[in-house]
Amino acid sequence: MNDVNVQVIVKSPPSEIWKIWSNFAEAPLWDTDVRQCQLDGPFQAGTRGKCVLKNGLNMPLKLEAVSLHESYRNSARLLWIDLEFDHRMRRLSADETHVVHSAKISGPLSFLYRGLLRKALTVAMTTALDNLCTLAEQRAIGAPRHGKTATPLHLV
């Protein structure tokens, strides 16, 4: 069972969202709760890395699963709490994608903080997903459209 679920419809193809997700160094552009993120290897299952949060905490993470252009899941440990973040998308049309981010909270002391963390994560993840949506839509507008060519105008 997920503790937090947020979702949005993005007016962008999945490829734009995937480019954003898979570039961990750019995570602060859309996830404003992080100051810096890095992976110590390629964007694939098993790769470890870390994010430094705005409050200065280091959050080690591991990519648990990566399904190209569909989803990825990472685990993280923050103090004595285990977090699992799931990022999924489903193409609705050529230029529209359903994106879902969810989080699970676990660990020996998670029951003490679950309510507070659930509220904080809901706010943070909603903001992050809104920012991701805006960024993907801006990039999609600037990206060349394949299969479509401009129609030249002739002055009469």
Region roles according to the model:
Residues D3-Q7, R48, N58, S71, ...:
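Intrinsic-disorder/low-complexity, polar/charged segments enriched in Ser/Thr/Lys/Arg/Asp/Glu/Gln
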Residues R77-T127, T134, A143-G147:
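Beta-strand/loop substructures that line and gate deep hydrophobic ligand-binding cavities in soluble
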Residues F43-K50, S67-N74:
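Short, hydrophobic/aromatic-rich segments at coil-to-beta transitions
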Residues P144-V156:
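Charge-rich (especially acidic), low-complexity segments
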Residues M1-Q38, L153-V156:
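Hydrophobic ligand-binding cavity/cleft-lining segments
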Residues V8, M59-A65, E84-R91:
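Hydrophobic/aromatic beta-strand elements that line small-molecule binding cavities or substrate pockets
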